[in-house]
């Protein structure tokens, strides 16, 4: 029967081929060509004619089929209506597909049909293979409007909305009146989206198919009609339980006899246990416990994880930044000034340990020279810095902040710069205020001493202490005599100390000062030439007991030359080494000088009335940096690099030794009450010592960014102190000392004064308070002195 069907099918196809109209090469289908409106009308006529031909050919084929069936087969075997229906359905499906397709013709043939045969002998049409070229993919199909990513809002004021592929304008579609637009916004049409079509400029609406797809997605319905959710299940296993076995073969004898093969395998395991190749779990645990205490000290076994709770992993290195790129942005590259500053900075103080560089490509980047050193330092950090686990403390942060009064309630204190004293060439290293508070004396690298009137800022006195053409010494320290009736100014420059009496103080003060200095010349001539040591600076009369041994002459008191005498220099003290600091006793007859390079004669005490100089120490441990007298006790404070010693001059004994904990002290100052001391250091610290409390600092203040050069208490009744640093700033503090020994001093930061420029890593070099007012004078490396007032 199947053979007959195939025969009839082949005959029907041959008949159709004979009756089908011939198609010329010029009318073959080509969907790639573009046609105009007239060609489209012709193509529609051709489609209609082709539909009629298809219908006629189908009718003729049905009649011929019925005749063939009647000749070869019976009606009971094959139903001719089935064949006719199938053919009719096929024809209808083809016509339905062709009715909605616009067929375009071209002059050249692009699709040639090749006829062949199936395996059963039927003919087949061999179509050309589709070449997967770029033109066959329309995923990146260009839009009709070629404006790209430009928004349509850019064309709102223009009559067109863009341009097509040929550069012609795409005109904007006509819009309705304002009433129509209002009605459309109220009554939304079906398929309304509120979007604009970029190709046409009109509102974008959804089709019925898209609306139906959205409805199915909202209702969780099946979006593909070809999928049947109710397909019949395939029962791979039957649900019926079989009672009888599929086979009733009796069990063989080998099922009930021990297996020889298993016996061999068991004996093999037994021999392994006897030989020790297989260890039972109990013995294995015992061996592991024994091996736990036996390990190789030099074994590099890093595979075993050590996940103990107290083991802390090494911190990870921070990720590289843009500065470390081989092609960093321009703003990360250093300028010539920044590069020079980076090279002059100490390696420990540099922000980065490399200079950002830019290369054209990665292959041009050379080897990193500091890689080995950085790895070594990383290893040292991990080896020498043990990691410690700290438990977090549940402490209220507000309780850690001291309850300090407001700075507004602690006025007066300096807040602004009122006067700038400018006249020195180079750095201004030191300055001092006379006891009356009217005159300011400054000394600098130019070797001159200048006296300024404080109220007007006018220079009233000038003295060339050092001749820069012959000597390179600088004026390192100067200080007025605390006795306002004499007007003596002591100046330390190089290895000499000059005693000046400025000619601006009036005849009486100038005469009293010169007379006090000249009295010493007579004692030096007719007095004790052996210059016995006398450390009792508070005594009214000399103690000439023979217990003190005669000391060698450590200084020379010289008379000035005529030119120096005309400038106001009354006496010159020649020392062995350069003098860096000097300080007067409160009575004005003694002053102490410090020469750090002079060894055991680093500290010298000079007596003005007798022209005597003596060294109170036979040996000196360490480098002496500063020395001060106690405000009212016969005590001398001597500061070395790391310690501060307090000597009793009347008993000539060491009374106390303070350990500030700093690496290199720069200066000290004593509170007017005498029971507190301030020390400054080059490692950015300010240390407050309570002399009645302990040898260690009561407070250590770290607020400066660079070395602290000097620190001073206010000598009047104001509880103020200030510190000067190389960062160019001056910090003013309020420090109240109470009579009650059980109450700690009150330290409150008040103001940070900035105005001096940092020159060659040097900022503010010295400072001094006004004896009566809350005024502060500072000397900077920028060649100026400044007055800070309230």
UniProtKB/Swiss-Prot annotation:
Has UniProt tagged this entry with the keyword Transmembrane? no
The major lineage groups are: Eukaryota, Fungi, Dikarya, Ascomycota, Saccharomycotina
Annotated WD repeats reside at: 423-462, 470-510, 574-616, 619-657, 660-699, 703-743, 759-790
Write out the similarity annotation: Belongs to the WD repeat BOP1/ERB1 family.
Q: Where is this region: Required for interaction with YTM1?
A: 371-407
Q: Where is this region: Required for interaction with NOP7?
A: 255-371
Q: How does it assemble?
A: Component of the NOP7 complex, composed of ERB1, NOP7 and YTM1. The complex is held together by ERB1, which interacts with NOP7 via its N-terminal domain and with YTM1 via a high-affinity interaction between the seven-bladed beta-propeller domains of the 2 proteins. The NOP7 complex associates with the 66S pre-ribosome.
Q: What does this protein do?
A: Component of the NOP7 complex, which is required for maturation of the 25S and 5.8S ribosomal RNAs and formation of the 60S ribosome.
Q: Which InterPro entries match?
A: BOP1/Erb1, BOP1_N_dom, WD40/YVTN_repeat-like_dom_sf, WD40_repeat_CS, WD40_repeat_dom_sf, WD40_rpt
Which gene does this sequence derive from? Answer: ERB1
Subcellular locations according to the entry = Nucleus, Nucleolus; Nucleus, Nucleoplasm
Indicate what this protein is called per its UniProt record: Ribosome biogenesis protein ERB1
